[in-house]
UniProtKB/Swiss-Prot annotation:
Tissue spec: Expressed in developing cotyledons. Not detected in leaves.
The reaction(s) this protein catalyses: dodecanoyl-[ACP] + H2O = dodecanoate + holo-[ACP] + H(+)
Protein source organism: Umbellularia californica
Annotated consequence of substituting M163W: Reduces catalytic activity 75-fold
Gene name of the record: FATB1
Protein name: Dodecanoyl-[acyl-carrier-protein] hydrolase, chloroplastic
UniProt cross-references to InterPro entries, sorted A to Z: Acyl-ACP-thioesterase_N, Acyl-ACP_TE_C, Acyl-ACP_thioesterase_NHD, FATA/B, HotDog_dom_sf
Length: 382
């Protein structure tokens, strides 16, 4: 053991010290004797006693012996260190690693769940999951060489002032990851009719391979100058067509038709919602996830405390600009925290034009953190 070896080294050092004369000095050594002709005759006073220069040299410690003892101590410590049971740290998944599968058509990227992405129940939110998918979308386009001047625009799209806008998104969540987990996002694109592009996602637990989230979205082209929808030019189709695959993460029959709300049918209403400068992307377009945040403005906190979103459908009807003022409306079906809930949502401009319709389905959380909440409180409409 390290203790035994070090103790032996210290005993050796002690023996060296005891071998010196009674004054703690080393014995007289012939190699330190000075020639009589060269020996100085002057005497020096040390603590009131006169000593010659030759005698002073005799009183110096034997540094070679001390150095040998110190070397022995360090050698013993180093030997014991190499004998310890040392194991290399397990290799972590390569975070933020981009790679492809299915002959280069399925893009994969891993994400570590950060502390700022989890809530009071220690799980991620639907917004954090959608942020990961949005980041994978842009890196997918960049990796296959179809990323132009803007986010998600190809070179031919940039020449024609075109950009992709999301028309519909559906997310189905089986389980939310927690802080410290690592997830892998898979995404791929395919055709949707004559003028649409479909993008599908699978989010997996890197440790177990379990599918946590499935998502599909439909995008169409919009002219950045006229802000009107456009057909897909042949040149653009030639850029993105080779990356299309015929596979879906969510079937169309899983997506239910959305209901229209108005002031008389909504349970919760909030107005005065406006986009800010940091809500815009490089295309001067309000980020899609900002619409989701506005939808949640009229969802009671009690629902977030007792339920998770199990599915989420969004239909974008109109673009809002930086000067827009919006209203968020929500109606809730069901009233017990022990059963599933369904919420219908609407975002509209202050003038009444629809911006977005949405539907969220909620399932009870498995934790007991909020067991005290039994019913969803009625709140007055504003």
């Amino acid at each position: 053991m390290a203790t035994t070896s070090l103790a032996s080294a210290f005993c050796s050092m002690k023996a060296v010290m005891l071998a010196r004369d009674g004054r703690g000095m080393k014995p007289r050594s012939s190699d330190l004797q000075l020639r009589a002709g060269n020996a100085p005759t002057s005497l020096k006073m040390i603590n009131g006693t006169k000593f010659s220069y030759t005698e002073s040299l005799k009183r110096l410690p034997d540094w070679s012996m001390l150095f040998a003892v110190i070397t022995t101590i360090f050698s013993a410590a180093e030997k014991q260190w190499t004998n310890l049971e040392w194991k290399p740290k397990p290799k972590l998944p390569q975070l933020l690693d981009d790679h492809f599968g299915l002959h280069g058509l399925v893009f994969r990227r891993t994400f570590a769940i950060r502390s700022y992405e989890v809530g009071p129940d220690r799980s991620t939110s639907i917004l954090a999951v959608m942020n990961h998918m949005q980041e994978a979308t842009l890196n997918h386009a960049k990796s296959v060489g179809i990323l132009g001047d803007g986010f998600g625009t190809t070179l031919e799209m940039s020449k024609r002032d075109l950009m992709w806008v999301v028309r519909r998104t559906h997310v189905a969540v089986e389980r939310y990851p927690t802080w410290g987990d690592t997830v892998e996002v898979e995404c791929w694109i395919g055709a949707s009719g004559n003028n649409g592009m479909r993008r599908d996602f699978l989010v997996r637990d890197c440790k177990t391979g379990e599918i946590l989230t499935r998502c599909t979205s439909l995008s169409v082209l919009m002219n950045t100058r006229t802000r009107r929808l456009s057909t897909i030019p042949d040149e653009v189709r030639g850029e993105i067509g080779p990356a299309f695959i015929d596979n879906v993460a969510v079937k169309d029959d899983e997506i239910k038709k959305l209901q229209k709300l108005n002031d008389s049918t909504a349970d919760y209403i909030q107005g005065g919602l406006t986009p800010r400068w940091n809500d815009l992307d490089v295309n001067q377009h309000v980020n899609n996830l900002k619409y989701v945040a506005w939808v949640f403005e009229t969802v009671p906190d009690s629902i977030f405390e007792s339920h998770h979103i199990s599915s989420f459908t969004l239909e974008y009807r109109r673009e809002c600009t930086r000067d827009s003022v919006l209203r968020s409306l929500t109606t809730v079906s069901g009233g017990s925290s022990e059963a599933g809930l369904v919420c219908d949502h609407l975002l509209q401009l202050e003038g009444g034009s629809e911006v977005l319709r949405a539907r969220t389905e909620w399932r009870p959380k498995l934790t007991d953190s909020f067991r005290g909440i039994s019913v969803i409180p009625a709140e007055p409409r504003v």
